[in-house]
Regions:
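N-terminal intrinsically disordered, cationic/polar leader segments
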Residues: 1-46, 52-132
Length: 132
């Protein structure tokens, strides 16, 4: 696997605690919260809530596959990743996590943009990353 590694120094900035309302997409909504607060890059500190259905991506490169998880009421167990909006025309947001379906079966992968709508609400905390 050929992977680029970037090491940078920086510090944490503002903390945003956000509530996503029903039928809002996880990735798009968190990106919008960053834009509302003038944040170009943020890390995910924590997320709780549920999704109507979930859609995760697994694998790497040409060997990726979609993992649909049927709801309603798919529980979010963990979310981690980074929101990068420095290139406004092409956001680079990668959020990964673990969810559980209505039977308690767990699934892990990268959340797919536009395919993970909040069920009731989702609460998330985002922390700004400022490069030195």
């Amino acid at each position: 696997m050929d992977t680029d590694v970037v090491v940078e120094s920086g510090h944490y900035g503002r903390l945003v605690v956000a509530r996503l309302k029903p039928n809002e997409d996880l990735i798009e909504s968190l990106e919008n919260k960053c834009l509302e607060h003038g944040i170009g890059r943020a890390i995910i500190r924590g997320v709780v809530g549920s999704l109507i259905d979930a859609s995760l991506e697994r694998g790497y490169g040409n060997t990726t596959c979609e993992q649909p998880i049927s709801g309603p009421g798919v529980e979010i167990l963990s979310v981690f990743g980074e929101i990068d909006l420095r290139d406004r025309g092409s956001p680079n947001t990668v959020l990964s996590g673990v969810v559980a379906d209505t039977k308690g079966q767990m699934f892990a992968g990268r959340f797919r943009r536009g395919a993970n709508l909040s069920f009731i609400t989702i609460e998330a905390s985002l922390q700004e990353w400022i490069s030195d």
